[in-house]
UniProtKB/Swiss-Prot annotation:
Gene: malL
GO CC annotation, single: cytoplasm
A molecular function (GO) term: alpha-amylase activity
Family that this chain belongs to: Belongs to the glycosyl hydrolase 13 family.
Protein name (Swiss-Prot/TrEMBL): Oligo-1,6-glucosidase
Keywords annotated in UniProt: Cytoplasm, Glycosidase, Hydrolase
Protein's cellular compartments: Cytoplasm
Length: 561
């Protein structure tokens, strides 16, 4: 495997709307981000991934782009953005931008033209179809509830939108559209950015004819994902993008890919194939949902998590590269999800960080994760802002599902869990804004905030800092091979990494009960040292056998015998 900077990096995701408000309007902005760069430098991250800051009507918080080459007024100006890039580079960090090209806003100039007439030169930049028997062209559901088609009276046809009706899908079969996209990507790269995170990039190729999905009783619209995820031309498009754009720069690329399998990821990230560096897969964050999808709650089984993460670790070894993440702007907070955000918040957050960051791949930290921010439990649906949450609530209430049932799902899985503003200190609104925040701050900001974390040498923040530092000091964390141990243990997630005559042993108690670790005989470390632990007081005893306290994590490094 070749050495590239993105393999040795740790990435920090900023959701600009919720990070830091500078001008007091209650909305995070670019000058706010600039004011916090020294904090990120202290943490030690190498790369900042900036969620969309492009001009947008904000139907889906910036993932509906009106102008790919302009900055959203609420966030600042292009001059502010250029200052941000320069300040990031001055501090020895890099910047990757969100690339949202499965769809645009319905207010984008291309779509405004496209809907004017059937023979408009921009008509085929989008996916237009006549209705079928007085109804939509097919039975696909939008990811945000309802039909994936909207009727447009001007031309009497429907346009496809896999997300909201203000996010029409772009037609990647049109070579002119692809040229425009590549030109726009090149424009940003020439400004000096260091790569892209590509939003739902495996949705861009649809199956010819856009066939109906398998109907389901009582459901007028059903997921058409079999016909647009990982579609027939996806590899062709990505290889063309690589040839026209990506190969000309020293970049990091990561493709967000719902429904991607390991076998497909081997193709998307295979070093010989010239597509992407890595993908975001969703297998491990789907393990706590029932058969009816995201809002259908079920407890996580540790054995499932071990099997899933280990399969991806082994499956991309020597072929491609893994992304490592627990959190992002669409996922609930990990300490609330897989940890204990009450009795063992600090211990479980550190354990989950250790478990992930010692694996092979590029770790991604989402803002607030490094201080153990938790899910929020708003009482009223009016307190929520997320379009996915609000549409789901409205649809399910109309079907007679009780308010309490829906709120339990929203408290566990709603995207606003990740979007409550960053908690900087104990002052009003957590130091995020002097105005009224666009989304309420989690009421626990007085106990959980950056100021408190920086004062406490045992905070979650310093544990993340240590994990990032260890990755820089020990090549085994970047390059070592991965093997799961104690596969059937119901409470311990343990694995080893091996590289260059060294073995790293990672042992994590996944629960709030005491449990005993017995190291398998085949794992032998000579001259072992305890590199990291999330408990203060030293317990005597060797790496071969010890008692694990609630959510305890230990990392040992030794030589191979």
């Amino acid at each position: 495997m070749s050495t590239q900077w993105w393999k040795e990096s740790v990435v920090y995701q900023i959701y600009p709307r919720s990070f830091q408000d500078y001008n007091g309007d209650g909305i995070g902005d670019i000058p706010g981000i600039i004011s916090r760069l020294d904090y990120l430098k202290t943490l030690g991250v190498d790369v900042i991934w900036l969620s969309p800051v492009y001009d947008s009507p904000n139907d889906d918080n910036g993932y509906d782009i009106r102008d790919y080459k302009a900055i959203m007024d609420e966030f600042g100006t292009m001059a502010d953005w250029e200052t941000l890039l320069a300040e990031i580079h001055t501090r020895g960090m890099k910047l990757i931008m969100d690339l949202v090209v499965n769809h645009s806003s319905d207010e984008h100039a291309w779509f405004v033209e496209s809907r004017k007439s059937k023979d408009n030169p921009y008509r085929d930049f989008y996916i237009w179809r006549p209705g079928k028997d007085g109804k939509e062209p097919n039975n696909w559901a939008s990811n945000f509830s309802g039909s994936a088609w909207t009727y447009d009276e001007t031309t009497g046809e429907y346009y496809l939108h896999l997300f909201s009706k203000k996010q029409p899908d772009l037609n990647w079969e049109n070579p002119k559209l692809r040229e425009k996209i590549y030109e726009m990507m090149t424009w940003w790269l020439d400004k000096g950015i260091d790569g892209f995170r590509m939003d739902v990039i495996n949705f861009i190729s649809k199956v010819d004819g856009l066939p109906d999905a398998e109907p389901q009783p009582g459901q007028p619209y059903v997921s058409g994902s079999n016909y647009f995820m990982n579609g027939p031309n996806i590899h062709t498009y990505l290889q063309e993008m690589h040839e026209n754009v990506l190969q000309h720069y020293d970049l990091m690329t990561v493709g967000e890919m719902p429904g991607v399998t390991l076998e497909l990821a081997q193709l998307y990230t295979g070093e010989e194939r010239n597509e992407l560096n890595m993908v975001f897969q969703f297998e491990h964050v789907g393990l706590d949902q029932g058969p009816n999808g995201k809002w259908d709650l079920k407890p996580l089984e540790l054995k499932d998590l071990k099997a899933s993460l280990s399969r991806w670790q082994k499956g991309l070894q020597d072929i491609g590269w893994n992304s490592l993440y627990w959190n992002n702007h669409d996922q609930p907070r990990i300490v609330s999800r897989f940890g204990d955000d009450q009795s063992y918040r600090v211990e479980s957050a550190k354990m989950l960080a250790t478990l992930l960051h010692c694996m092979k791949g590029t770790p991604f930290i989402y803002q607030g994760e490094e201080i153990g921010m938790t899910n929020v439990r708003f009482d009223s649906i009016e307190q929520y802002q997320d379009i996915e949450t609000l549409n789901m609530y409205k649809e399910k209430r109309a079907q007679g599902v009780p308010h309490e049932t829906l709120m339990a799902s929203i408290h566990a899985k709603g995207r606003d869990n990740a979007r409550t503003p960053m908690q900087w200190d104990e002052t009003k609104h957590g130091g995020f804004t002097d105005g009224t925040p666009w989304l309420e701050v989690n009421p626990n900001y007085k106990e959980i905030n950056v100021k408190q974390a920086l004062k406490d040498p045992n905070s979650i923040f310093y544990h993340y800092q240590k994990l990032i530092q260890l990755r820089k000091e020990h090549a085994i964390l970047v390059h070592g091979s991965y093997d799961l141990i104690l596969e059937d243990d119901p409470e311990i997630f343990a694995y080893k990494r091996t590289y260059n005559g060294q073995t790293l042993l990672v042992v994590c108690n996944f629960y709030g009960r005491i449990t005993d670790f017995e190291c398998p005989a085949e794992v032998v470390l000579s001259e072992p040292t305890l590199l990291l632990s999330n408990y203060d007081e030293e317990e005597n005893g060797s790496y071969t056998s010890f008692r694990l306290r609630p959510y305890e994590a230990r990392v040992y490094l030794g030589k191979n015998e």
